């Protein structure tokens, strides 16, 4: 994987045209993976849920803190903290010369993504996005995506206290991204890969700097 940074200045008048040409050249397709997933909390039998999803929609709001062992009970209304797994199987036909990434907007508190039983990446923190390249993990036909999410308290992950509960779940949108071999980098903190900074501003003129991260698979 090769990463290059391109930087240039443009006037406000030409900004839309320049950005339009960049995004057209990127030629990426985004396929939402929201919707029906199989979900299992703490080893319990799987059920169908709709992602984005949290398993604390009711128990975190009723004020029942409960011990963790109580939260393992099916009939308990205690605030549940622990591991859960989201599973989804989907047909994918990887195209030659294309690259594939999976991006999640947020999972609380830590998460691990696997594709066809092979690890794609892990993330800590409930409020930031994650993105991994999964090109070498995909196969033609049926592919199984697994997202392990755990909202167990961890002393090294903030926040530890607040006037809110730490909801567990895959609670923001998740998507599959297809790009060319050379693309605007989706892996830099799962950001858009395009950064715009105002350099000067007056009543008659505005100048901005556009920095773009390009990611190459090394074949181009």
List the predicted regions and their residue ranges.
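Accessory carbohydrate-binding/adhesion or oligomerization-edge regions at the termini
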Residues: 25-70, 144-150, 154, 164, ...
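Beta-strand-rich binding/interaction modules
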Residues: 115, 203-220
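Short beta-strand segments of immunoglobulin-like
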Residues: 194-203
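Accessory beta-strand-rich segments of carbohydrate-active enzymes
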Residues: 39-42, 81-192, 217
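Bacterial N-terminal signal peptides
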Residues: 11-21
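Bacterial N-terminal signal peptides that target proteins for export
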Residues: 2-13
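Active-site region of glycoside hydrolase catalytic domains
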Residues: 186, 196-197, 209
């Amino acid at each position: 994987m090769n990463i290059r940074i391109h930087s240039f200045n443009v006037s406000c008048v030409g900004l839309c045209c320049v950005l339009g040409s960049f995004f057209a050249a990127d030629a990426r397709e985004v396929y939402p993976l929201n919707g029906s997933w199989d979900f299992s909390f703490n080893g319990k039998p799987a059920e169908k849920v709709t992602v984005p999803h949290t398993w604390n929609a009711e128990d975190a709001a009723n004020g029942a803190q409960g011990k963790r062992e109580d939260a393992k009970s099916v009939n308990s209304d205690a605030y549940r903290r622990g591991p859960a797994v989201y599973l989804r199987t989907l047909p994918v036909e990887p195209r030659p010369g294309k690259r594939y990434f999976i991006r999640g907007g947020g999972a609380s508190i830590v998460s691990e993504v696997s594709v066809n039983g092979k690890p794609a990446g892990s993330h800590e923190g409930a409020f930031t996005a994650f993105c991994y390249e999964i090109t070498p993990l995909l196969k033609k036909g049926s592919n199984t995506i697994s997202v392990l999410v755990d909202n167990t308290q961890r002393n090294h992950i903030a926040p530890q206290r607040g006037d809110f509960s730490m909801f567990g779940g895959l609670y923001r949108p998740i998507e599959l991204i297809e790009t060319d071999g050379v693309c605007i980098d989706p892996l830099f903190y799962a950001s858009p890969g395009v950064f715009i900074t105002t350099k000067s501003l007056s009543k008659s003129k505005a100048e901005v700097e556009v920095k773009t991260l390009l990611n190459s698979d090394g074949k181009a």
